[in-house]
Curated annotation (Swiss-Prot):
Protein name per its UniProtKB record: D-alanine--D-alanine ligase
EC number(s) on file: 6.3.2.4
Molecular function terms from GO: ATP binding; D-alanine-D-alanine ligase activity; metal ion binding
Pathway: Cell wall biogenesis; peptidoglycan biosynthesis
Similarity comment: family membership: Belongs to the D-alanine--D-alanine ligase family.
Disulfide bridges in this chain: none
Annotated source species: Rhizobium meliloti (strain 1021)
Keywords associated with the record: ATP-binding, Cell shape, Cell wall biogenesis/degradation, Cytoplasm, Ligase, Magnesium, Manganese, Metal-binding, Nucleotide-binding, Peptidoglycan synthesis
């Protein structure tokens, strides 16, 4: 039993609120089972006042999306001097901005796809890059707003310039990498293993593939050559360290296998607030490495600190 009081931050007001509610509820339940005193905090604009009144020993950050994983809540927790899980202010802000994260990764020698950043409103009838390419919001998660432009499309999709677009005006246009999708979790200074993600009935690992039951198949350990498996783990740890992450992160990759066992391996992005239900990718990897869900969360709580 632990006498620690843990405030689990969940919900919030980003487009990823439903995801956060799932993660936060699962984490709160598991932490209670581990013996912690848990308070669930559905985050609103008054979160600083709520936490000042609660004065928990640790905050478990189960928020996703802007405010929860872009350095904002991390800055509030630093100001309040409450130890918290996951990455700190700078690493969170860097990782949330796909463009900045890509620059840091490239400088660290991590292979990335060619890309450019532009205002989505400047899209005309001309392709900004030779198709196929991917358009993704610079500051969104859960694959919100991701559009794949195929080779046979004569002009960019109108949805990008539509008034109904709600993912910010800065978008990244990135060369599309064919092939298989892999992901690797990092816990502290250890890579947890590599999972292959196989979307079921979807062109890529979109929102439904991630969160709808049966939307994707997770293969762990990934069935891939040992040298590529090890390379993915090495690059995931390298990205975690280059961006300055703490606690847990997850890096996503595409591998275009040319059939020679080598192929092209590309790092796509890093997630400092990966999904945290028992069947989410990183907890699955932790279990594969020998850590049950509750034990994994206990490690995260005991790893919590300020000045992250």
């Amino acid at each position: 039993m632990s006498s620690k009081h843990v405030a689990v931050l969940l919900g919030g007001f980003s487009s990823e609120r439903p995801v956060s509610l799932s993660s936060g509820t699962a984490c709160a339940d598991a932490l209670e089972a581990e013996g912690y005193r848990v308070t669930r905090v559905d985050v609103g604009r008054d979160v600083a006042a709520v936490l000042q009144e609660l004065r928990p020993d640790v905050v478990f950050n189960a928020l996703h999306g802007p405010f929860g994983e872009d350095g904002t809540i991390q800055g509030i927790l630093e100001y309040l001097e409450i130890p918290y899980t996951h990455s700190g202010v700078l690493a969170s802000a860097l990782a949330m901005d796909k463009d900045q994260a890509k620059h840091v990764a490239k400088a660290a020698g991590i292979p990335v796809a060619e890309a450019l950043v532009m205002d989505r409103r400047s899209f005309g009838n001309q392709h900004p890059m030779k198709p196929p390419y991917v358009v993704k919001p610079v500051r969104e998660g859960s694959s919100f707003g991701v559009v794949i432009v195929k080779e046979d499309q004569s002009h960019p999709p109108q949805v990008i310039t539509s008034s109904e677009w709600r993912y910010g005006d800065r978008v990244m246009v990135e060369r599309y990498i064919a092939g298989r999708e892999f992901t690797c979790g990092v816990m502290g200074d250890v890579a947890l293993g590599v999972t292959e993600i196989i979307p079921q009935g979807h062109a890529f690992y979109d929102y439904d593939s991630k969160y709808v039951k049966g939307g994707s198949k997770h293969v762990i350990p990934a069935q891939i050559s040992p040298n590529i498996y090890q390379k993915i783990q090495t690059l995931a740890l390298k990205a975690h360290q280059a961006i300055g992450c703490r606690g847990v992160s997850r890096s996503d990759f595409r591998f275009d296998d040319r059939g020679d066992g080598e192929g092209e391996l590309i790092w796509l992005e890093i997630n400092t607030q990966p999904g945290m239900t028992p069947t989410s990718l990183v907890p699955e990897m932790a279990q594969h490495a020998g850590l049950q869900f509750g034990e994994f969360l206990r490690w995260m709580v005991e790893d919590a600190s300020c000045l992250r």
